């Protein structure tokens, strides 16, 4: 449920409830207010793509330029530091646009007045975290200046990369104050005071009681923040901060330390690269060429356009690695075309929404990257393990579409189809067809790591879109890079805050306690996996998949390991299960994206998608209880 690239409930508030930032200003001040962070994001994103692409190519080209194996030792470290900078610098942009991964199932049902009061609470809570990390990070930098440390490769003083924390959280505070000022004007004095009083009530227990058991604080505050509408990442960070204040089990500057070190990781960098690759290739015309090829192959059959749509979604999944990105890129092309050929618009939107969920199963997949990092499992094996469930889901959706279309009399398009037209479509789509070869071939051929393959895919998409197809203009290119940076930042910050939350859970032995409780009920593997699947299906209906993975992996993984489940197999189960949440009412993000493209009512669309969800559940059961099938390629 995450993202044009990553969001389960990416909330982009509109109308009366959204005019948070200050009014537009003319001239240079207005431009700075709207765009201050964006040039840094564009420069940083392009820099890390080029640096890691250079690292990958130089490793092999350098062999011929110099004797022996060649390696550019500085590239990875420099790319990691730039990656951390752009991840946090993108958050102020998200604040200004009010785009975040959040649970809004309760928020959306509130009257407008209470929604506006809720925004006051959200801004104050977020501002509290930003100000705290800003203050803590200044202490960290002071310590680095007093006791200098340098990075291994670049010999860079660590206070320089650590500067990202005061700079970015300072900018967040500025953007939040802008948003809060605008929200105060909307709410008026009385409702603003109500919001501030509610914030004080939220914080009061931490300062009134001498000691509070940390577990109720951790989970109680997190639940409260979700209900209020605080973004999930910020809720995790605030709940962790509240627990530190209440229990005193960790130093107060712990949050700032982990905010940096938790994402100082090369494998995590695959996420922005895969997102950028999907954005570049979608805007660069590759999705349209893939659809033409799929239509050439399947368009003559009953329900041919629906079959072509599913096939295109499956292949585009190997480019974008994202469900909503696939729905947005493919749905904007196929839903109008299906309606034009006589298909019901609700069926058209449902097919695209369900097929878009395959995007997180077929590699590359951002959820697999997140799980691999969280569980310390092989990302390469996870990628391979997602292939069979993704193909089974696609084939099941195709079979249903064929049967339903035949029943409704939706025939294929009648036109000349022969070897010449097929080869022409293949030739037109050749650059898109090369992407899985580059990514998967590079990984499983031992040529590149998943992160390097992702960087090369982003570089490839950029070159094809700008110079081969020439559909990425300067303006659209700039917007694409900003979009990719912003989307990936929401995921990265979520992982950062979830690491803090998870570390406190580990200190308080929460995973061990839950594992003992569940295993006390039964040690039967079938029953344990059934309970976990039901839990994930419930959570997937209201929480974004990536958030669920980073929160639940530390809790559930010890349980399945105790009953003998392979961690790679469990990762596949988890991702296939949470993929169903992309299309599960009431908050499946694929449904919302598809309904927006089709101009279809979400209530009616939710009914039409139910048979497709049933098919996806059948694939989940096969994936869970016949491990040889998903593990066929994963070994």
Swiss-Prot record:
Q: Quote the pathway field.
A: Organosulfur degradation; alkanesulfonate degradation
Molecular function (GO) terms for this protein are:
transmembrane transporter activity
Q: Which UniProt keywords apply?
A: Cell inner membrane, Cell membrane, Membrane, Transmembrane, Transmembrane helix, Transport
This protein's record includes keyword Flavoprotein: no
InterPro entries annotated for this entry? DctM, DctQ, TRAP_DctM
Gene null: resulting phenotype: Cells lacking this gene lose the ability to grow with isethionate as the terminal electron acceptor.
Membrane spanning stretches? 38-58, 75-95, 117-137, 154-174, 192-212, 217-237, 266-286, 299-319, 350-370, 379-399, 431-451, 453-473, 481-501, 526-546, 572-592, 609-629
A single GO CC term for this protein reads:
plasma membrane
Q: GO terms for biological process?
A: alkanesulfonate catabolic process
Localisation per UniProt entry = Cell inner membrane
* Membrane topology, from the record: Multi-pass membrane protein
- Write out the function statement from the record: Part of the tripartite ATP-independent periplasmic (TRAP) transport system DctPQM involved in the uptake of isethionate (2-hydroxyethanesulfonate), which is then catabolized by enzymes encoded by adjacent genes in the locus. Thereby is involved in an anaerobic respiration pathway that converts the sulfonate isethionate to ammonia, acetate and sulfide.
Family label:
In the N-terminal section; belongs to the TRAP transporter small permease family. In the C-terminal section; belongs to the TRAP transporter large permease family.
Describe the protein's quaternary organization and the partners it interacts with.
The complex comprises the periplasmic solute receptor protein DctP, and the fused transmembrane protein DctMQ.
Q: What is this protein called?
A: Isethionate TRAP transporter permease protein DctMQ
Q: Source gene?
A: dctMQ
